[in-house]
Structures are given as C-alpha cells and as structure tokens.
C-alpha cells in the first residue's frame, strides 16, 4: 500500500513544523452560534478535509481583497488562513464563485476545481484544476485538457459512465454560441470534452447558450445512473436523464419552473420517500420568479408543492441548502437571501429563523461538522455556524470507494432505524456551494441504526447492521464492517525560543487520523530549515505515540 503523507503545522515557534509519514494499511437555546470569518466578504464555499487530518476545512470564493480564501481547521474551533499556499495559482481576474472539492485522480486527497466566476463574459478566462499532492495545490488545468476559456460560474463532479473516475460538468454563461461542457475523466490525469457525444450540446436560451445558473448531478430517476439538473437564468430549467449508454436524454416536466431568474439549488430527500427532491431558489420580484419546492414523482417527473409544504418565497432568493439541523430525521431548509431558516415538521416547513440563530448574518447555506461533535454545523456568506445540539442522536458516514470513485460520489446510503428510513446521496457539489461529502443522519431519540445499506456507483451493495449512534464511521467499498473516524491530535512541549549553541530537546505526542485500515506510523520528522537547522530530522519513537527530538 502506498505511503500516505500528511503535513500539519503545529508549532508557532518560527516556522517549525512536523511532517508525519503514515503507512497505508436547553430550552430557549438557538440551534446555531455564529462566528464571523476573518475575511467576511466572500461568496460561495466548498467544504472538505484537504489535508486528511480528520478536520474539515473550507475554501471560500468571491472574497473581497483576496478573491479566494483557504481556511484550515485547527481542531480547536479556530481556522488558520492558508490562502498564501494557493494564491500564486490564481489568475488576476478570477473571482471563483463556483468551486468544488473531489479526488479526481483517486490518490486519496481532495483536489479542487475553481470556476473563473466572472459574470462579465468579455472578461472570461481559464478555470483552475488544483491537484492536491500531500496538501500542496498545483494548477494542472492546461495539462489535464481543461483549456476552454469561458465565464464559468459553477460546476459539479459526477461519474456519468460509472468507470470509477470522476467527470466534470461546467456551467458557462455568455454569448449564444457558448455551451455548458461535459469533460470525461480519462483515468490518466487528463479529460476529454464529450459534450456533443453525450447529447449535451444544448443551447439554453437565445441570449446565452450556457445556463448561468445552478447545477446538480444526482440519480433523479432511481436507476443507478447520475442525471443532470440545470437551473437556467431567465429561461426554462432542464433535466437530463442518463441512459446508461453514455448519453443524456432531456425530460420535459412542466413543473420544473417557468422562465424566472433561477439561481441556486438544494438537493435532498425532504419527504423521506427514497428519492431526490429539489428546492429551486429564484431571484426576481415577480410571481414568475418565485422559488419552487419540487417533489420527485419518479421517472424524471416533478410536482410543484411549494405552497402545499408551507413555503412562499418570491423576493430575490439566492443561496440555499438542505440539512437536518435539528437531528430529528428529516431535512430542513435554509436560504441565504432572504434570510430564512425552515424547520421540516413531517413534510411541512415552518419558519424558525428567529429561533435558529442570532447575529447580523445570513444563515448557513452549506453544511459540515467542523467540530466533529456529530451535529451539522453551517457555512454562510460571512460567518460559520456551530450547532449547539439538542440531545438527539446522530450517525455520520464517510465513504471510500475502491472500484467506485474514491469519494463515493453518486453512492446512496439508506439508514433504517425502527420505522424511520432516510436516504442520502453523496453529491459532487451543487450550485454555488458544496456540502461536506459525509452522509449525516439525524436519529432523534433513537440510539441505534438497525440497518445501513450502501449502493455504490460500481453496483456493489454493502449492508451494515446494528450500528451504535453518536459516532462517525468510515466504510470502504466491499469491506466488511466499518472503521471509527478519529481526528489528528497533536501535543507538543517546546521551549519559547532556540539559542545558538544550546542543546534543544523537543517532545511531541502524535495521534493522526490514519486513513486506511491497518495503517500505522512509520516515522516522524521535524523540518528545522527556517530556524537554521536541517530540512529533515527524524524523531525517535518513545512509545504510545510519543516522539522525541
């Protein structure tokens, strides 16, 4: 098994760092407490653990001043700004606003696609594909074949041919001749434009051939193949079903939406009937522009149930997301604009904005568990939102594909607890934000998941039974059982400064987030190059995860 390499800065003493090598093998309380980001003026976000330390990080785009921000989760509720690590890869005019993590090369770490993101077509430029090599990002878009110059504003990862390699679909705004593009992953680090042969050489409007709205890829007709939903700004929204033979076929559904100002989209099974429903957030101020709750009827048919489920949003709706923020077993709904939080009460949505959080922030529109307590935290425009919990139980599941793509994008998980059955599908982004690629199940007062079925894109089906609640587990495709997920823990005892000629002895306790089953630490080294020492000094093992220098 290949050696995995994880780098984490743990000492504030100059630039002293450790490198570690792993061998594979209450009543009245609001739901969220909010904390403003250091750079609050940002737009979209992608959530994921880019350095494999067990703590999810965030990449933010459309930021004032820096354009983008890469924030590293320190594991103590704080985030360190790592934007400088990727700043040199960013074109001068890039805004971002369309970003998604995924392990496109199946090497075990999250790579990052960043859409150019400028809505001015005359200032279009290239997109970025940032390959992650042990926590170091390098733009490889040109060598990977992603050379088209467009005003791309969002993208999704999917494995449309189910060959185990993630493909990419991009939304491109602009002139009538512009098209959205589908890139097939060749499995060798390169991509090929297969838009035409896949049946997607489609003009979405007379003014702009591309969609200029949110995208979502998911299995909308329950046949095991990922389909495409395309929200179109000022034109009809579209649904393309995957025929399993390499082509997409457009399905006409009247209730998918009139030609309004479609913006973002939320995807999830809000009625717990086992299929993917949609919430289409739509801008504008007319009745034509109202947002839509679209109930999946199967076979590509959707029913507009917006008023029936208690939602009436007409004015300028933008970013949105589904997540079970109260852990009761059904998906709640949030809107960044207008600022609204809806609680799902058995299929009826109730506005609980005033009870959800306090502070002068828009609510969260993407979801993750950044403090690893099992409850869904939120990410918004200007702030992150810590879920205070309510005593209900949860289960979180992280997938690792073997025959399927590494992230398990496209996999379906069905959790059964007594009479409660919930379905989650791992998505490779959606719209202008990306949720953490971890399936979260709120269980209410239930303390055990009776049965967990995982349907992988490869066709493999794994079944686990009798899983205790209140934990995060990792499931490897085709392996029996599951593995508990534990984050990295680092403890160091160091002097305040180094003195020339003096003897220095350091001790560090290392308990990393080992990724593979049976993995173990092979060695720990210190990089002293920025304090006048060598680049690599091996520490001596003292037992129980303790190493000395």
Residue spans of the language-model regions?
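Blade-edge motifs of beta-propeller repeat domains
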Residues: 26-41, 72-94, 130-150, 183-210, ...
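Short glycine/acidic-enriched loop and turn motifs that connect beta-strands
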Residues: 64-66, 118-121, 174-177, 235, ...
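Hydrophobic beta-strand segments that make up the repeating blades of beta-propeller
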Residues: 55-62, 112-116, 168-173, 228-232, ...
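Bacterial N-terminal signal peptides
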Residues: 12-21
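A short loop-to-beta-strand structural motif that recurs across blades of beta-propeller domains
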Residues: 69-71, 126-130, 179-183, 238-240, ...
